[in-house]
Amino acid sequence: MYGIEYTTVLTFLISIILLNYILKSVTSAMDFIIYRFLLIIVVVSPFVKTQNYGINVPITGSMDTAYTNSSQQETFLTSTLCLYYPIEASTQIGDTEWKGTLSQLFLTKGWPTGSVYFKEYTDIASFSIDPQFYCDYNVVLVKYNSTLELDMSELADLILNEWLCNPMDIALYYYQQTNEANKWISMGQSCTIKVCPLNTQTLGIGCTTTNTATFEEVATNEKLVITDVVDGVNHKLDVTTNTCTIRNCRKLGPRENVAKLQVGGSEVLDITADPTTTPQTERMMQINWKKWWQVFYTVVDYINQIVQVMSKRSRSFNSAAFYYRI
């Protein structure tokens, strides 16, 4: 009897010892695997270029971050300035060294050599299709033209504000604008926009949905169109999609690192009629028309005052970003 009990106890002890050994072996193996895995991650991570998404961080539209205005009581040692001008300016000046001259003049106002970039554009229409703002501060010179007032106004609305945009499939869906901040923005070589408002039965109001000739034409052969229709009403659209793209956009607020200087004209164009547009005449300024050398001299003289009403930003803006966020 005692032999059986001793055997049982001995078997139990041996089982415990064996189990403990197995657990230690497994633990050691797991530690080896984990440490080796972590070592591989540490070694490989510098060479892997992937996006860190964080933990469910919501994206609310604009990813721009406003910095404290650096123009208050210091020189612009860490800031960049882009000056956009029409090609006619360089043509009239006719001096291959004029940019270097202006850079030296900007230096006298606290802008180090190499911090000011000169960006040339052909005309308002082409600039509207592909605006690119890569500097901390961006100043756009636009010469007034009475025949281009609409283009100038829409360009100002586009570049002086941030927009959140999504693609539109006008072949499959009807669209409506929910409020005054909601606009349809079209860009392209030639944009002709026609709309047909619909009633609750999706029948055309004053138009026939199957006949685009009966649609209301709101833009003809333009390169930039910001379309505003009656809110809360579905619309069938007809757009020259082979030469134009259209996006459903929402105005988020002012883009404060961009200013527009109108050269000439009796008064600066006003885009504040839209109730969603924060009064921004501070970033829409006017210079009386003179020779282009005189215009640039004026810009140099007042550049620090101009920058005072702007805010430095950390991200660039180009036309690709426009389609989803500007």
UniProtKB/Swiss-Prot annotation:
Q: Which GO terms describe its molecular function?
A: metal ion binding
Region described as CNP motif: spans on this chain: 165-167
- Residues annotated as region LVD motif? 237-239
Q: Where in the cell is it found?
A: Virion; Host endoplasmic reticulum lumen
Binding-site residues, Ca(2+) 1 = D95, G206, T214, E216
Which residues does UniProt assign to the signal peptide? 1-50
Q: Name the glycosylated positions.
A: N69, N145
Q: Which Pfam families does the annotation name? A: VP7
Q: Which GO terms describe its cellular component?
A: host cell endoplasmic reticulum lumen; T=13 icosahedral viral capsid; viral outer capsid
In this chain, Ca(2+) 2 is annotated as bound at: Q177, D228, V229, D231, D301
Where in this protein does the record put region GPR motif?
253-255
Alphabetically sorted, this entry's keywords are: Calcium, Capsid protein, Disulfide bond, Glycoprotein, Host endoplasmic reticulum, Host-virus interaction, Metal-binding, Outer capsid protein, Signal, T=13 icosahedral capsid protein, Virion
Q: How is it modified after translation?
A: N-glycosylated. The N-terminus is blocked possibly by pyroglutamic acid.
Family listed: Belongs to the rotavirus VP7 family.
Further comment: Some rotavirus strains are neuraminidase-sensitive and require sialic acid to attach to the cell surface. Some rotavirus strains are integrin-dependent. Some rotavirus strains depend on ganglioside for their entry into the host cell. Hsp70 also seems to be involved in the entry of some strains.
Q: Say what the protein does.
A: Calcium-binding protein that interacts with rotavirus cell receptors once the initial attachment by VP4 has been achieved. Rotavirus attachment and entry into the host cell probably involves multiple sequential contacts between the outer capsid proteins VP4 and VP7, and the cell receptors. Following entry into the host cell, low intracellular or intravesicular Ca(2+) concentration probably causes the calcium-stabilized VP7 trimers to dissociate from the virion. This step is probably necessary for the membrane-disrupting entry step and the release of VP4, which is locked onto the virion by VP7.
Output this protein's name. Outer capsid glycoprotein VP7
